[in-house]
């Protein structure tokens, strides 16, 4: 069963650490660990404690999800957009109320900006991630969180 297998994680291998460092630098006192393909930020002082805890208890989640490295590209996790960290790996685009609501509904809307990943914010509050492509916009807001009626 899922409860018989402890949460497995390792420190990020050097190659992946170099790829991540080229895109994003974690705040001081944080390390990056890897669980399957997912990158997770964990306070340095918690690492050895988490090793002990996971050996004796079922751990469902630890730290804050940063995202997944796909080659030299970081596909950011929604947790990172929701964090209070000042520095993000990609540029933030401020949107108006209508575009913010469209984003939260996962509805189509137009957004001007350079091609690539961006965080979306409304009134300086980050909402999530989009990827601007030449002819469309991919919305990475969690589907289960979307606004259905407003």
What are these regions (language model features)?
Residues 1-150:
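Polybasic, low-complexity RNA-engagement segments
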């Amino acid at each position: 069963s899922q409860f018989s297998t402890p949460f497995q994680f390792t420190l990020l291998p050097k190659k992946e650490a170099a790829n991540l460092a080229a895109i994003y630098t974690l705040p001081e006192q944080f390390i990056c660990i890897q669980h399957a393909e997912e990158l997770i930020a964990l306070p340095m002082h918690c690492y050895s404690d988490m090793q002990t805890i996971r050996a004796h208890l079922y751990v469902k989640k630890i730290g804050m999800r940063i995202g997944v490295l796909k080659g030299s590209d970081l596909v950011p996790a929604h947790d990172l957009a929701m964090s209070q960290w000042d520095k993000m790996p990609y540029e933030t685009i401020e949107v108006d109320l209508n575009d913010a609501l469209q984003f939260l509904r996962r509805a189509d809307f137009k957004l001007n900006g350079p091609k690539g990943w961006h965080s979306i914010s409304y009134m300086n509050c980050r909402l999530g991630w989009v990827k601007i492509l030449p002819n469309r916009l991919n919305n990475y807001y969690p589907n289960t969180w979307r606004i259905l009626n407003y």
